């Protein structure tokens, strides 16, 4: 089985890598828990015939730590798992690095193919913000990424804190048959509920863009967040301001 070693990957969007986050300590209610420092990621091929997105990422990703140990991801740590059309999006907690997470973006053409990943955590990140959105919490950390795929460019924004994580994905609209209609937005865009094995998710199409919103929060909280999003054509999308 082919293994690709990516040392210090923070973002992988088919190309490029950057320095890893250092997460030697995790704050948990005032108690410091020492953890190994993550230094890289091994990416293996997804076994042919893999149907489940969670099985795909668990088979594919191994985290490497400074002390020489390796940890595979586990399906029990999946935070959300969403599929719309041929797009797959999954978030999973990282072993031995809590609270630390990974968001993995896949596409499927017969088999699951990873298009990008983002690793992030709580330690050392900037302050929580709100950006004029109706968030599940008063404010949350925000991290974004962009996958410059010639076939279908994708932008992602993940809003998170110690326990909750919501990702907003925007890409060019395409014909989709997934989901159950929920209601219409003021602009007439129909929202569709996704049947997810983990977390809740919905999507809608507006101004020639498909917007997917998914996370480990209630559907009501997702709908409230979606109601607060600006138009996809807004330069600041998904935010109302830059601060």
Model-identified regions with their sequence ranges:
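C-terminal motif of bacterial Sec signal peptides marking the signal peptidase cleavage site
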Residues: 13-16
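Repeat-associated, polar segments at repeat-unit boundaries in modular proteins
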Residues: 102-123, 219-229
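Hydrophobic helical h-region of N-terminal Sec-dependent signal peptides
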Residues: 6-11
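Surface-exposed amphipathic alpha-helical segments
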Residues: 210-243
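N-terminal, intrinsically disordered, polar/charged segments of Gram-positive cell-envelope systems
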Residues: 18-79, 86-91, 116-117, 121-143, ...
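Exposed beta-strand-loop-beta-strand "reactive/processing" segments of non-cytosolic proteins
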Residues: 68-115, 199-203
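Positively charged n-region of N-terminal signal peptides that target proteins for export
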Residues: 1-4
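Short, solvent-exposed recognition patches
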Residues: 60, 79-81, 87-95, 121-206
